């Protein structure tokens, strides 16, 4: 495996080892660090894993996460998720069981939305006609020029941290048809591998993973 700096090495193979646990086999990290300090630019590392080497992993709700590589370093990876409701859609009229939106820009079929604390999912979008999987308890229609009632797109901000290295992903979706699908976006992570199980429940996706509170 090619590494081009010491941070890349520690991310993939871990940091310095203690004499107590590794004895005379503890010097690889020191050697690689000195290699780059002294002007080295390309270092090839071959990992020899013991039979019992494991990958740090965790599963909560619909989200399964594991470290990108085996080793204890993965135990220090931290992931945080937060619900985001920035994009909004104004529904200006009702049409049968569907609604007419002022604009559907940024919204797709399968997206989770929120209106007055109630979660729903977009079933279909045709032109500006939008239908939802569930019924709203309160009427979401607002014909005003400046709307007071709007439907919000529910997305998730994700932060992946390992020591000083941080990967931030903004406004991700659990909708597989979205260009911001969490599974596709986190596939580019150099710290973790993620698997997402489709969730048919309509609710806050972060609460479905982490619980309320």
Residue ranges: model-predicted function:
Residues 1-213:
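Surface-exposed assembly/interface segments
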């Amino acid at each position: 495996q090619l590494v081009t700096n010491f941070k890349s090495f520690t991310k993939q193979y871990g940091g310095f080892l203690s004499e107590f646990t590794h004895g005379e086999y503890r010097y690889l990290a020191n050697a690689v660090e000195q290699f780059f300090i002294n002007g080295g630019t390309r270092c090839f590392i071959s990992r020899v894993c013991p039979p019992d080497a494991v990958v740090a992993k965790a599963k909560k709700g619909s989200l399964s996460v594991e470290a990108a590589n085996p080793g204890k370093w993965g135990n220090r990876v931290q992931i945080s998720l937060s619900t985001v409701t920035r994009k909004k859609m104004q529904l200006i009229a009702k049409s049968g069981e569907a609604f007419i939106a002022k604009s559907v820009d940024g919204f797709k079929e399968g997206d989770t939305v929120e209106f007055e604390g109630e979660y729903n999912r977009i079933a279909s979008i045709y032109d500006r006609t939008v239908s939802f999987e569930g019924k709203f308890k309160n009427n979401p229609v607002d014909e005003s020029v400046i709307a007071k009632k709007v439907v919000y797109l529910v997305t998730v901000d994700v932060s992946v941290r390992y020591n000083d290295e941080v990967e931030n992903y903004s406004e991700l979706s659990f909708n597989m048809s979205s260009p911001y699908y969490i599974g596709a976006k986190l596939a580019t992570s150099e710290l973790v591998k993620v698997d997402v199980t489709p969730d048919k429940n309509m609710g806050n996706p972060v609460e479905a993973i982490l619980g309320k509170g």
